[in-house]
UniProtKB/Swiss-Prot annotation:
<feature type="compositionally biased region" description="Acidic residues">
    <location>
        <begin position="599"/>
        <end position="855"/>
    </location>
</feature>
<feature type="short sequence motif" description="YSIRK-G/S signaling motif">
    <location>
        <begin position="9"/>
        <end position="20"/>
    </location>
</feature>
<dbReference type="GO" id="GO:0098630">
    <property type="term" value="P:aggregation of unicellular organisms"/>
</dbReference>
<feature type="signal peptide">
    <location>
        <begin position="1"/>
        <end position="39"/>
    </location>
</feature>
<feature type="compositionally biased region" description="Low complexity">
    <location>
        <begin position="106"/>
        <end position="132"/>
    </location>
</feature>
<dbReference type="GO" id="GO:0007155">
    <property type="term" value="P:cell adhesion"/>
</dbReference>
<dbReference type="InterPro" id="IPR008966">
    <property type="entry name" value="Adhesion_dom_sf"/>
</dbReference>
<protein>
    <recommendedName>
        <fullName>Clumping factor A</fullName>
    </recommendedName>
</protein>
<dbReference type="GO" id="GO:0001968">
    <property type="term" value="F:fibronectin binding"/>
</dbReference>
<dbReference type="Pfam" id="PF04650">
    <property type="entry name" value="YSIRK_signal"/>
</dbReference>
<dbReference type="InterPro" id="IPR050972">
    <property type="entry name" value="SDr-like"/>
</dbReference>
<feature type="compositionally biased region" description="Low complexity">
    <location>
        <begin position="47"/>
        <end position="65"/>
    </location>
</feature>
<dbReference type="InterPro" id="IPR011266">
    <property type="entry name" value="Adhesin_Fg-bd_dom_2"/>
</dbReference>
<feature type="propeptide" description="Removed by sortase">
    <location>
        <begin position="894"/>
        <end position="927"/>
    </location>
</feature>
<comment type="similarity">
    <text>Belongs to the serine-aspartate repeat-containing protein (SDr) family.</text>
</comment>
<feature type="short sequence motif" description="LPXTG sorting signal">
    <location>
        <begin position="890"/>
        <end position="894"/>
    </location>
</feature>
<feature type="region of interest" description="Disordered">
    <location>
        <begin position="529"/>
        <end position="898"/>
    </location>
</feature>
Length: 927
């Protein structure tokens, strides 16, 4: 009834008075009134005056219960067919400026997803209402009777609306009946931990007072108000309305909802006609921007309708002359909307309702403002609640001590957020600060909406300074120098218009607790601008900074820095270790080490080792050894030797030998040796040897050796060795070794070793080693070892040795040798020898030797070595020293591989020395 009165009033005001004067007949009045009543509904002015009524008197809606999940819900799309053609319209992308990401429409259809509150009306009269729902969210469809329109002109108009973080949608004509489909949205804010005690019910969360006062300026909006036209809201057909959001909205985490609309425009619409979108008072369309605008609806590059926001926060769109020339115009619209902090002041459930005419959509969401940050007795939280990009200003509201704890000597500082390119200007000229005291913490709104009239202004009682660039400092000068109630600090600042950075601020509260411990607590706020629009309140989070080292210390302004951390480490370790190991290894290692080691080791070990090792070793060795050796050895050797030797030897030897040798040897040797040796030796040997050897050796050796050795050795060795060794060794060795070693070794060794060794070893090793070692070792070792070893070794060695040997030998040899030797020797020897030998030899030899020797050796040796005073027929106890110096072509020390020929070569060496000495003596006599 009221609508009819309004319609008559509108007709009488605009049309009927003029018609009665001109026509003056009742027939004309009757004909005109029936048509004008349908086309001339409320004007914009009337719509504005009745907006509150339409908000409360819209057709019934179904409120969706809150969900337990956060599934996003998208706007709906409605499709219908027309007789001859259709025109679809979507809103323009870049016209709406807000502080949060908004959505865009896409030209795709997708299957429905859960949780959208959507209402759709069809262009078919008397179509029954249906409800589409998922989980606990409900959708409502309300029938709306409309007139079908026909057209012979087919126009398709499309444009893309680009508020961010959304999915574009376009209405598609399909069938006569209207189908509603949902598109998924990616717009849900990521939730953070919330305090369940802060969740209030709807009547606590929503301020029901009216009228609403918006945070944005409507002056510019009013200036853009269109010329009054006809309100055709109820003549729109195929109307769809949707509220797209998760079940929880976090306003202080840039959370927002999307309002989605779709409709068809009647062909009778003309330029100046309007329609209204009702927006719930719990939402606003500006976020934190000071002025709100709504996007125009675009048809390609042409404006279909322009929108403004009225004083109640609703949206009025006015059609342009585009509709005068087009039929079957369809449009879709998406607007981001934000929780209004003035009307929703606390955390709790809120029911949102929006619509076009009698078509509405409802959805209940949980608004979660989250709690302040707290660290011991310090609590703080801030938010950026207003930005004016026109004047380059911002407003930040900070709650200091919202928990109401006791804070002694409190100090608040504000500065740019570290490690960001913040565009804020903080100084005395660009920053204004107000401080308010709150007597009761319950008076603080969780939405950070502040009415200054409700609190005491104490700005003049505090000390505000700007101690550093881009930093302010607020000292709360209370009589007892402590605070026990909350304070509100409102900062009005400026933004650098020339900066490309975002607005990022840090607020830090310092203070003592009751135990007089100085601590600090910080809160960060950010706002990012994207595509010319503000992106909301930003991601707010508490920060616990590094605590001050000194009481009263204020955090300095951080500066950008690049750091290249470096570390120095030193380690001092003493280790005592014992191990049983069997290894098959292939290693390629490069090492440069300098070590200074002083170790004293007393070891008593019984070892039974069965090891299979395959070794391929490439080693480059440069060795400087200083060795002092005193060796007393008893040896009993039984040798049976079968030797086949093919030797090509080029030797340049300068030997000065003084040998005193006392040897008692019983040797039984059975040796099968196949040796291929090519030896190039440049040897300067000065040897001083005092050897007393008693050796009992039983050796069965099968050795296949291919040796290429490159060794540069400077060895100074002082060794005192007392060795009693009983060795039973069965060794099969296959070794391929390429050794390059650079070693400088100074060794002073005093070794007393009693070793009973039974070794069975199978060793296959492939090793490539590049070692540069500088080793200074002082070792005192007392070792009692019982070792059972079975060794199978395959050795391929490439050795280049440069040896300088100084040897002084005093040898007393008593030898009984019975030798049966079968020797096949092919020797090519080029020898240049300068030898000065003084020998006192007492030799009694009984040797029984059967030797079959096949030797093929290639050795390049350049040795500069002072060898230890080792016995000629050493036992297994000296294997450790021999292994270290095995690459040096030194005299045979009685190892397992050479024990079988020691007696023969000792006898030959004695005879050769006597002959050489006699020849020199004869040469001297001739001279």
């Amino acid at each position: 009834m009221n609508m009819k009165k309004k319609e008559k009033h509108a007709i009488r005001k605009k049309s009927i008075g003029v018609a009665s004067v001109l026509v003056g007949t009742l027939i004309g009045f009757g004909l005109l009134s029936s048509k004008e009543a349908d086309a001339s509904e409320n004007s914009v002015t009337q719509s504005d005056s009745a907006s509150n009524e339409s908000k409360s008197n819209d057709s019934s809606s179904v409120s969706a219960a809150p969900k337990t999940d956060d599934t996003n819900v998208s706007d709906t799309k409605t499709s219908s067919n027309t007789n001859n053609g259709e025109t679809s319209v979507a809103q323009n992308p870049a016209q709406q400026e807000t502080t949060q990401s908004s959505s865009t429409n896409a030209t795709t259809e997708e299957t429905p997803v859960t949780g959208e509150a959507t209402t759709t009306t069809t262009n078919q009269a008397n179509t029954p209402a249906t409800t589409q729902s998922s989980n606990t969210n409900a959708e409502e469809l309300v029938n709306q009777t409309s007139n079908e329109t026909t057209s012979n002109d087919t126009n398709t108009v499309s444009s893309v609306n680009s508020p961010q973080n959304s999915t574009n949608a376009e209405n598609v004509s399909t069938t006569q009946d209207t189908s509603t489909e949902a598109t998924p949205s990616n717009n849900e804010s990521a939730p953070q931990s919330t305090d369940a005690s802060n969740k209030d019910v709807v009547n606590q969360a929503v301020n029901t007072s009216a009228p609403r006062m918006r945070a944005f300026s409507l002056a510019a909006v009013a200036a853009d108000a269109p010329v009054a036209g006809t309100d055709i809201t109820n003549q729109l057909t195929n109307v769809t309305v949707g509220i797209d959001s998760g079940t929880t909205v976090y306003p202080h985490q840039a959370g927002y909802v999307k309002l989605n609309y779709g409709f068809s425009v009647p062909n009778s619409a003309v330029k100046g006609d309007t329609f209204k979108i009702t927006v719930p008072k719990e939402l606003n369309l500006n976020g934190v921007t000071s002025t709100a605008k709504v996007p125009p609806i675009m048809a390609g590059d042409q404006v279909l309708a322009n929108g403004v926001i009225d004083s109640d926060g609703n949206v009025i769109y006015t059609f342009t002359d585009y509709v005068n020339t087009k039929d079957d115009v369809k449009a879709t619209l998406t607007m981001p909307a934000y929780i209004d902090p003035e009307n929703v002041k606390k955390t709790g459930n809120v029911t949102l309702a929006t619509g076009i005419g009698s078509t509405t959509a409802n959805k209940t969401v949980l608004v979660d403002y989250e709690k302040y940050g707290k660290f011991y007795n310090l609590s703080i939280k801030g938010t950026i609640d207003q930005i004016d990009k026109t004047n380059n200003t911002y407003r930040q509201t900070i709650y200091v001590n919202p928990s109401g704890d006791n804070v002694i000597a409190p100090v608040l500082t504000g500065n740019l957020k570290p490690n960001t390119d913040s565009n804020a200007l903080i100084d005395q000229q660009n920053t204004s600060i107000k401080v308010y005291k709150v007597d009761n913490a319950a008076d603080l709104s969780e939405s950070y909406f502040v009415n200054p009239e409700n609190f005491e202004d104490v700005t003049n009682s505090v000390n505000i300074t700007f101690p550093n660039p881009n930093q302010y400092k607020v000292e709360f000068n209370t009589p007892d120098d402590q605070i026990t109630t909350p304070y509100i600090v409102v900062v009005n600042g400026h933004i650098d218009p020339n900066s490309k950075g975002d607005l990022a601020l840090r607020s830090t509260l310092y203070g003592y607790n009751s135990n007089i411990i100085w601590r600090s607590m910080s809160w960060d706020n950010e706002v990012a601008f994207n595509n010319g629009s503000g992106s909301g309140d930003g991601i707010d989070k508490p920060v616990v900074p590094e605590q001050p080292d000194e009481p009263g210390e204020i955090e300095p302004i951080p500066e950008d820095s690049d750091s290249d951390p470096g570390s120095d480490s030193g380690s001092d370790s003493n280790s005592d270790s014992g191990s049983d190991s069997g290894s098959d290894s292939t290693s390629d290692s490069g090492s440069d080490s300098a070590s200074d080691s002083d170790s004293a080791s007393d070891s008593d070990s019984a070892s039974d080792s069965d090891s299979a090792s395959d070794s391929d070793s490439a080693s480059d060795s440069d060795s400087d050894n200083d060795s002092d050796s005193d060796s007393d050895s008893d040896s009993d050797s039984d040798s049976d030797s079968d030797s086949d030797s093919d030797s090509d030897s080029d030797s340049d030897s300068d030997s000065d030998s003084d040998s005193d040798s006392d040897s008692d040897s019983d040797s039984d040797s059975d040796s099968d040796s196949d040796s291929d040796s090519d030896s190039d030796s440049d040897s300067d040997s000065d040897s001083d040897s005092d050897s007393d050897s008693d050796s009992d050796s039983d050796s069965d050796s099968d050795s296949d050796s291919d040796s290429d050795s490159d060794s540069d050795s400077d060895s100074d060795s002082d060794s005192d060795s007392d060795s009693d060794s009983d060795s039973d060794s069965d060794s099969d060795s296959d070794s391929d070794s390429d050794s390059d070693s650079d070693s400088d070794s100074d060794s002073d060794s005093d070794s007393d070793s009693d070793s009973d060794s039974d070794s069975d070893s199978d060793s296959d090793s492939d090793s490539a080693s590049d070692s540069d070692s500088d080793s200074d070792s002082d070792s005192d070792s007392d070792s009692d070892s019982d070792s059972d070893s079975d060794s199978d070794s395959d050795s391929d060695s490439d050795s280049d040795s440069d040896s300088d040997s100084d040897s002084e030998s005093d040898s007393d040899s008593d030898s009984d040798s019975d030798s049966d030797s079968d020797s096949d020797s092919d020797s090519d020897s080029d020898s240049a020898s300068d030898s000065d030998s003084g020998s006192d030899s007492d030799s009694s030899s009984d040797s029984d030797s059967e030797s079959d020797s096949n030797s093929d050796s290639e050795s390049v040796s350049n040795n500069n070595v002072v060898p230890p005073n080792s016995p000629k027929n050493g036992t297994n106890a000296s294997n450790k020293n021999e292994a270290k110096d095995s690459k040096e072509p030194l005299p045979d020390t009685g190892s397992e591989d050479e024990a079988n020929t020691s007696l023969i070569w000792g006898l030959l060496a004695s005879i050769g020395s006597l002959l050489l000495f006699r020849r020199k003596k004869e040469n001297k006599d001739k001279k």
